């Protein structure tokens, strides 16, 4: 399935591999037009190249923006290579793509994604290891296989990955997920691709970073093995992880108009590139919606688009540093001309004071994930 078209534009600079991207019609707009968006949000809450140049040990890989705030990039699997559009997700650890034999629970073929044709790859090998992942109202089942995986010019031979043979997702505008979290949360038990490449000496530094462009068409990248300083302003502020082994950091408080509205005693936040929204506990999210004048329609909250000039910034204080997100960043207009709030209930844990800072936050702030020092760096994106 090809929801997006890549423009073959390539930018090169010293010590960089860069693959530019483009966004076309988004999934959110498509579902809104068909009046299917509320059903999608209810059933699928978060659980969740191309041309490449490489110099030195820094690889910059392009991402495309879909569903207004979801970013995907291309990888290939197999010999000869088969191409897949995947979400680069810091909230999970596994590389997952559908098998050519994948079925839905009703025995119909899986969603219209591209599917891996294992019989066409000369480097593919099976294992007897299986896995099952539960999410929301459905499940995903598969087995662990091995094959050659390429991210731009990065090559991982005999890479273990999850090959899905049963899934209950609605049609989705991407093929799979490439997890970038620590190995300990892997569902399949396979070594994540970043760890395997790191162990093989593919990177001069065990880091990766995200620049998520606000532009609707192109410019977003994920970079491996280093940081391109042209993508942010000022200095990186480093935040130690709460629990080494997961990309969660301490959140001091959340405030609006200099008044604390959440996390008054501190809480924690997962920095999650695999979700478009900012997710938090139900009571706090509902309080934020009241502060910004949002009205609920099923599972979404809408705000008058004209309010963007009157609403205050929402400030996330992390490790003593304020990270404001202005209304121009947290209000998003859909295809119907309505503006919606990105603050949503974390349905996986609706009562706990745990947050997920998704792409609404990360479009504003360049992020560096440092595996060598168990920390995350944040700076204002250009």
Curated annotation (Swiss-Prot):
<comment type="function">
    <text>Has no proteolytic activity.</text>
</comment>
<keyword id="KW-0325">Glycoprotein</keyword>
<protein>
    <recommendedName>
        <fullName>Pregnancy-associated glycoprotein 1</fullName>
    </recommendedName>
</protein>
<keyword id="KW-0732">Signal</keyword>
<keyword id="KW-1015">Disulfide bond</keyword>
<feature type="disulfide bond">
    <location>
        <begin position="305"/>
        <end position="339"/>
    </location>
</feature>
<feature type="domain" description="Peptidase A1">
    <location>
        <begin position="71"/>
        <end position="379"/>
    </location>
</feature>
<feature type="disulfide bond">
    <location>
        <begin position="263"/>
        <end position="267"/>
    </location>
</feature>
<feature type="site" description="Ancestral active site">
    <location>
        <position position="272"/>
    </location>
</feature>
<keyword id="KW-0964">Secreted</keyword>
<dbReference type="GO" id="GO:0004190">
    <property type="term" value="F:aspartic-type endopeptidase activity"/>
</dbReference>
<dbReference type="InterPro" id="IPR001461">
    <property type="entry name" value="Aspartic_peptidase_A1"/>
</dbReference>
<dbReference type="Pfam" id="PF00026">
    <property type="entry name" value="Asp"/>
</dbReference>
<dbReference type="InterPro" id="IPR012848">
    <property type="entry name" value="Aspartic_peptidase_N"/>
</dbReference>
<dbReference type="InterPro" id="IPR033121">
    <property type="entry name" value="PEPTIDASE_A1"/>
</dbReference>
<dbReference type="InterPro" id="IPR021109">
    <property type="entry name" value="Peptidase_aspartic_dom_sf"/>
</dbReference>
<dbReference type="Pfam" id="PF07966">
    <property type="entry name" value="A1_Propeptide"/>
</dbReference>
<feature type="glycosylation site" description="N-linked (GlcNAc...) asparagine">
    <location>
        <position position="74"/>
    </location>
</feature>
<comment type="similarity">
    <text>Belongs to the peptidase A1 family.</text>
</comment>
<feature type="signal peptide">
    <location>
        <begin position="1"/>
        <end position="15"/>
    </location>
</feature>
<feature type="glycosylation site" description="N-linked (GlcNAc...) asparagine">
    <location>
        <position position="57"/>
    </location>
</feature>
<dbReference type="InterPro" id="IPR001969">
    <property type="entry name" value="Aspartic_peptidase_AS"/>
</dbReference>
<feature type="propeptide" description="Activation peptide">
    <location>
        <begin position="16"/>
        <end position="53"/>
    </location>
</feature>
<feature type="glycosylation site" description="N-linked (GlcNAc...) asparagine">
    <location>
        <position position="128"/>
    </location>
</feature>
<dbReference type="GO" id="GO:0005576">
    <property type="term" value="C:extracellular region"/>
</dbReference>
<feature type="disulfide bond">
    <location>
        <begin position="102"/>
        <end position="110"/>
    </location>
</feature>
<dbReference type="GO" id="GO:0006508">
    <property type="term" value="P:proteolysis"/>
</dbReference>
């Amino acid at each position: 399935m090809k929801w997006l078209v890549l423009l073959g534009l390539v930018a090169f600079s010293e010590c960089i591999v860069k693959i530019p991207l483009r966004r076309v019609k988004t999934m959110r707009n498509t579902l809104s037009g068909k009046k299917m968006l509320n059903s999608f949000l209810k059933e699928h809450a978060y659980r969740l190249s191309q041309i490449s140049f490489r110099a030195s040990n820094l690889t910059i890989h392009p991402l495309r923006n879909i569903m207004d705030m979801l970013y995907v990039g291309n990888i290939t699997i197999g010999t000869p290579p088969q191409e897949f559009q995947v979400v680069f997700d810091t909230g999970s650890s596994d590389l997952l793509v559908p098998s050519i034999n994948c079925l839905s629970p009703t025995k119909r073929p899986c969603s219209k994604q591209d599917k891996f044709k294992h019989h066409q790859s000369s480097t593919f090998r099976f294992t007897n290891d299986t896995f099952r992942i539960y999410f929301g109202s459905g499940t995903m089942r598969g087995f662990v296989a091995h094959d050659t995986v390429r991210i731009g010019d990065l090559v991982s031979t005999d890479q273990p990955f999850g090959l899905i043979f049963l899934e209950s997702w609605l049609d989705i505008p991407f093929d799979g997920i490439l997890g970038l979290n620590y190995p300990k949360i892997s569902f399949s038990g396979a070594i994540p691709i970043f760890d395997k490449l790191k162990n093989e000496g593919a990177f001069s530094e065990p880091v990766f970073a995200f620049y998520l462009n606000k532009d609707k068409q192109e410019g977003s990248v994920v970079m491996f093995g280093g940081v391109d300083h042209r993508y942010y302003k000022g200095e990186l502020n480093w935040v130690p992880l709460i629990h080494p082994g997961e990309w969660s950091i301490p959140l001091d408080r959340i405030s609006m108009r200099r008044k604390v509205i959440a996390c008054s005693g501190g809480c924690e936040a997962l920095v999650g590139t695999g979700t478009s929204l900012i997710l938090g506990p139900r009571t706090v999210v509902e309080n934020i919606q009241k502060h910004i004048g949002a009205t609920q329609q099923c599972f979404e909250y809408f705000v008058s688009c004209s309010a963007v000039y009157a609403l205050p910034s929402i400030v996330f204080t992390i490790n003593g540093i304020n990270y404001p997100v202005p209304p121009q960043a947290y209000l998003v207009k859909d295809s119907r001309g309505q503006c919606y709030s990105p603050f949503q209930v974390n349905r996986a844990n609706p009562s706990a004071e745990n947050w997920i800072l998704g792409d609404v936050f990360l479009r504003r702030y360049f992020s560096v994930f440092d595996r060598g020092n168990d920390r995350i760096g944040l700076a204002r994106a250009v």
